[in-house]
A protein has these predicted regions:
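Amphipathic alpha-helical segments that form well-ordered structural scaffolds
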Residues: 192-196, 275, 418
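Structured alpha-helical segments in the cores of large, soluble enzyme domains
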Residues: 158-164, 189-197, 240-247
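Helical scaffold of the NTase/Pol beta-like nucleotidyltransferase catalytic core
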Residues: 145-148, 181-205
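Generic structural signal marking isolated hydrophobic packing positions
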Residues: 177, 220-221
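A short, glycine/Asx- and small/polar-enriched loop/turn
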Residues: 215-219, 311
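Active-site microenvironments that recognize anionic phosphate/pyrophosphate groups
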Residues: 1-182, 253-255, 270-273, 279-446
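Catalytic or ion-translocation cores adjacent to nucleophile or general acid/base/metal-coordination motifs
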Residues: 184, 198-215, 223-275, 281-284
């Protein structure tokens, strides 16, 4: 019979607590079980050698090995990732993925206090630095002794390839610069993306500009082996761009404003990508409320996503703009206040592609809400869910009533609708006739 790794470790951790070796709290338990797993995880050089051997067979064989190892070593805590709630919702743009992230553990008050009193450490500089491999961790920095990194060459420099410990989707990987240098998007960004896709043609890779919610002080990308709704979305119409007649260019049927470039020659996509990036950075269209900068602060940027489909390389460019107004202090093209009960955080890269990562509080709130709807209780009287009352009023009339059998399905569907609206808020050019005309005005300038 097989025993789950979590069960074995839990037994050892309980014993360690009983003997007074560690304090009984999640932070200290995580630090200790990582130390234990390091004794069983092959050394970095062994992992790299095995990866290289399998890469000779095929890139996929190498990543399959590395992904399984990253879970077997408990670096990716499978038993936590399993707790995430996941469902799909049909939308006008295809099937959208929703997840409520429950795998990042909540810190307990004791550990938070200890972290406050811990003196600031400048090693590793951040959680993406290569020094994390084998690092024992602190109360305010996760232990990474069971973590392994595959060195790769990107744009003629040393980079690292690893998986995200909080797998948001299949084979969610992070590709990061060997040096701790800040992120910036430029022509070289496109070179780096395609260098990686050429190494691992079954993976997509994307850049994460300032607009998302990630570590910006360290140059990195995120990718993986997953086909997002955006990648499945068709092109609404195609265009020809002067001097790039050999590249297929089109507007993607998607709530965010996305241009898709396709060619069998990735160097053409790099050139055209750089041309579009420069053009967008300097582009103002007052009628469409697009301003390249106000008071010297630049607003326009791009989220690029690179992938290979058959023999064809694709580069998706999502146009972003972070301008703020009094009415929308967090951003005009940011989730608007009416949706903040579901999603207040920035729209990160993963969301742009059609996977909502929603806060863990939502699981409990949906459960309480379901109970209140079935029982017909007053939502405004419960402080945990009163923020959802106005939202519930918007869809209550669509259904013949709520029962224990249908209420969760209805709530999941409505959360999906909210997320679609959130994505529409983030789109610079709306999916309306007027929005499309304005989008084409930008394309004309290319």
């Amino acid at each position: 019979e097989t025993i789950e790794l979590e069960t074995v470790l839990a037994g050892l951790l309980d014993e360690a607590c009983k003997r007074g070796i560690i304090e009984d709290s999640i932070v200290y338990r995580d630090l200790f079980d990582t130390k234990i797993m390091n004794c069983l995880t092959p050394r970095p050089a062994q992992v790299q050698a095995e990866f290289a051997k399998r890469y000779e067979v095929s890139p996929k064989e190498a990543t399959d090995y590395f992904y399984k190892l990253s879970q077997d070593s408990d670096y990716i805590r499978r038993y936590r990732v399993k707790k995430d709630r996941k469902w799909k919702v049909d939308s006008a743009y295809g099937e959208i993925d929703i997840t409520i992230n429950l795998s990042k553990p909540e810190k307990d008050p004791k550990a938070i206090a200890a972290a406050k009193n811990a003196k600031a450490s400048s090693y590793p500089k951040c959680q993406l630095c290569v020094e994390n491999e084998g690092y024992a961790g602190l109360v305010n920095h996760p232990a990474r002794e069971n973590h392994r990194i595959i060195p790769i060459t990107v744009n003629d420099s040393a980079w690292g390839f690893q998986y995200s410990p909080y797998v948001y989707y299949n084979e969610h990987c992070i590709v990061f610069n060997g040096e701790h240098t800040p992120m910036k998007i430029e022509k070289q960004t496109f070179v780096k993306l395609f260098d990686f896709v050429k190494l691992f043609p079954h993976y997509f890779l994307a850049d994460l500009p300032i607009v998302g919610g990630s570590i910006l002080s360290h140059d990195h990308f995120q990718g993986g082996n997953y086909t997002f709704a955006m990648a499945k979305a068709p092109m609404e119409e195609t265009f020809t761009i002067k001097n790039f007649e050999d590249v297929e260019v089109g507007i993607v049927k998607w709530p965010l404003s996305v241009l898709r470039l396709r060619s069998t020659d990735e160097s053409r996509l790099i050139e055209l990508g750089a041309h579009i990036l420069d053009a967008w950075r300097g582009y103002t269209d007052e009628a469409a409320f697009v301003f390249a900068n106000t008071d010297g602060e630049p607003h326009n940027t791009i989220t690029p996503i690179a992938r290979k489909v058959g023999d064809t390389y694709e580069l998706d460019l999502a146009l972003r703009n972070n301008i703020t107004t009094e009415e929308h202090p967090l951003g005009v093209y940011h989730p608007h206040a009416q949706w903040h009960n579901i999603k207040k955080e920035n729209i990160g890269l993963i969301e742009v592609m059609g996977l909502a990562v929603l806060p863990s509080r939502l699981k409990e709130e949906m459960e309480i809400l379901a109970d209140y709807l079935v029982e017909g209780k007053n939502i405004r009287e419960n402080e945990k869910i009163e923020k959802h009352a106005d939202w519930v009023e918007t869809f209550r009339g669509k259904y013949d009533g709520f029962t224990k059998e249908n209420v969760m399905e209805i709530l999941e569907k409505e959360v999906g609708i909210v997320f679609t609206n959130v994505l529409e808020d983030a789109g610079v050019y709306k999916c309306t006739e007027e929005g499309r005309i304005a989008f084409k005005r930008f394309i004309e300038t290319l």
